[in-house]
């Protein structure tokens, strides 16, 4: 699989009053920088919503059925897995949140035969030919 960094840059508008409080905490050593504070706050918010997230994951997995590869986090296929799926006549649809990766040495024609569609809220790492075929950014 690709060794690309599994993070994305996000722009957020924060009002001056809130930002000044973050800066006060950073300047006094509570956080190493603004990004550290924001990442900590996001992790805390996700922890607070863990039961909701778990319930939504379960609902999506049940709803997707066996012909869909549903995921959250990081997922993907190696060239070997694509070859095996192709040989067995397996077809799938990829749906998920996070990062989906296909080995860059995957045979594009086999990928097209195996994966009917790819819909990822996040990032897809694959060859330009595969991105173009599925209309991915």
Which residues are covered by each model-predicted region?
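Short, T/G/N/S-enriched strand-turn elements that build extracellular solenoid repeat scaffolds
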Residues: 65, 80-93, 104-117, 132-137
């Amino acid at each position: 699989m690709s060794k690309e960094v599994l993070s994305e840059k996000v722009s957020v508008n924060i009002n001056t009053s809130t930002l000044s409080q973050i800066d006060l905490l950073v300047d006094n050593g509570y956080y190493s920088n603004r990004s550290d504070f924001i990442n900590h706050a996001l992790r805390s918010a996700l922890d607070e919503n863990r039961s909701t997230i778990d319930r939504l994951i379960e609902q999506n997995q049940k709803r997707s059925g066996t012909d869909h590869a549903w995921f959250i986090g990081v997922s993907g296929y190696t060239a070997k897995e694509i070859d095996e799926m192709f040989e067995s006549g397996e077809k799938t649809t990829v749906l998920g949140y996070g990062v989906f990766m296909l080995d860059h040495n995957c045979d594009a024609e086999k990928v097209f035969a195996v994966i009917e569609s790819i819909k990822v809220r996040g990032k897809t790492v694959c060859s330009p030919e595969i991105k173009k075929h599925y209309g991915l950014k």
